[in-house]
């Protein structure tokens, strides 16, 4: 039974899903705007927002924890150096999802995922 199991499988194995969201998180933090399918966008919010909350308190332990989840030293630096100070006063809701129609070919619902207050 799947009682109380949160998260969406998205038709992938656990390792594939973990790697995909790791890559999507790095892309989101690098470009601050990405386009993806709506279910992936909604699940990405559950992965990326806690990292920004974690980065608001800068410590070696938090940097190591963020690195263990992102595996990209440059993006960890940007997360703690640029993004966390930007959202210091905001108590959550760092990511905005904007629907942008359906994809040609398979008619999948698409969405833009962007960081709020980006320049």
Curated annotation (Swiss-Prot):
Keywords assigned by UniProt, alphabetized: Ribonucleoprotein, Ribosomal protein
GO molecular function, one term: structural constituent of ribosome
Pfam families linked to this entry: Ribosomal_L17
SUPFAM superfamilies, sorted: Prokaryotic ribosomal protein L17
Family membership: Belongs to the bacterial ribosomal protein bL17 family.
GO biological process, one term: translation
KW Ribonucleoprotein (keyword) present: yes
Native organism taxonomy: Bacteria, Pseudomonadati, Pseudomonadota, Gammaproteobacteria, Moraxellales
Subunit structure: Part of the 50S ribosomal subunit. Contacts protein L32.
Organism: Psychrobacter sp. (strain PRwf-1)
Cited PANTHER family: LARGE RIBOSOMAL SUBUNIT PROTEIN BL17M, RIBOSOMAL PROTEIN L17
Protein name, entry field: Large ribosomal subunit protein bL17
InterPro entries reported for this sequence: Ribosomal_bL17, Ribosomal_bL17_CS, Ribosomal_bL17_sf
Domain of life, source organism: Bacteria
Any one Gene Ontology cellular component term annotated for this protein: cytosolic large ribosomal subunit
């Amino acid at each position: 039974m799947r009682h109380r199991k949160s998260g969406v499988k998205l038709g992938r194995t656990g390792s594939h899903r973990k790697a995909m969201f790791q890559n999507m998180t790095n892309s989101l933090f690098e470009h601050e705007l990405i386009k993806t399918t709506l279910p992936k966008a909604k699940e990405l919010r559950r992965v990326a927002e806690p990292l920004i909350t974690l980065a608001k308190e800068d410590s070696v332990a938090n940097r190591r924890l963020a690195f263990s989840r992102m595996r990209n030293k440059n993006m960890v630096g940007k997360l703690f150096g640029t993004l966390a100070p930007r959202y210091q006063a905001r108590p959550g809701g760092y990511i905005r999802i904007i629907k942008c129609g359906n994809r040609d070919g398979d008619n999948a619902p698409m969405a833009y995922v962007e960081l709020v207050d980006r320049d």
